[in-house]
Regions:
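Beta-sheet ligand-binding and adhesion/scaffold domains
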Residues: 23-45, 52-59, 63, 73-170
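Short coil-to-beta strand junction motifs in C2/discoidin
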Residues: 68-71
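Bacterial Sec-dependent N-terminal signal peptides
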Residues: 1-26
Length: 170
């Protein structure tokens, strides 16, 4: 009976632990594209305001051996199973060689792994397919970092004079 009560209590508390995980902050790591077999830098900044998660992503792409970037606003949520769901909301800036298709959006489904010395988000990404483009898939692995000066995304906000976008966390 005692084991049953402990097991029941543990099952009731697990969802509370999942939803109490702190995901705000700056995350830096890599994005692996299954199609191109390229691993490139990837950054996320997540903030929470008025009970809602939002943020920004900074991703890089190689086209013809040249590196291009895109900075996007993202919507962030935590699914019932504890997965971190990140969806593109709007493309803010890029240096793409062609005008990007407005209908392509990326979806990340990440697991939050908490270790003694680091927090990691790891999982899959997929883009939707359109008439012109097929879907892309891949893998994202990012670690929470505290050194904002090491971040290309933070340097972008500083250059734009938009540090108030990230002041919630600093």
């Amino acid at each position: 009976m005692k084991k049953f009560l402990l097991s029941s209590l543990a099952l009731l508390l697990i969802p509370l632990l999942i939803f109490s995980q702190e995901i705000t902050g700056l995350w830096k790591g890599t994005m692996y594209n299954d199609s191109t077999k390229n691993t490139l830098p990837y950054e996320l900044f997540i903030k929470k305001e008025n009970g809602k998660y939002t943020g920004f992503s900074h991703s890089w792409f190689l086209i013809g051996g040249k590196e291009y970037y895109g900075i996007k606003e993202v919507k962030v949520s935590i699914a019932k199973d504890g997965k971190i769901v990140i969806k593109d909301a709007a493309l803010m800036e890029n240096n793409y060689p062609v005008l990007p298709d407005k209908n392509i959006h990326q979806l990340n489904i990440l697991d939050l792994l908490i270790r003694e010395d680091e927090n990691i988000m790891d999982g899959l990404f997929i883009t939707n397919c359109t008439k012109q483009f097929r879907e892309l898939t891949g893998h994202i692995n990012v670690k929470r970092i505290n050194t904002f000066s090491e971040s290309s995304l933070m340097q972008y906000f500083k250059k734009k004079g938009a540090e108030n976008e990230v002041a919630v966390i600093k």
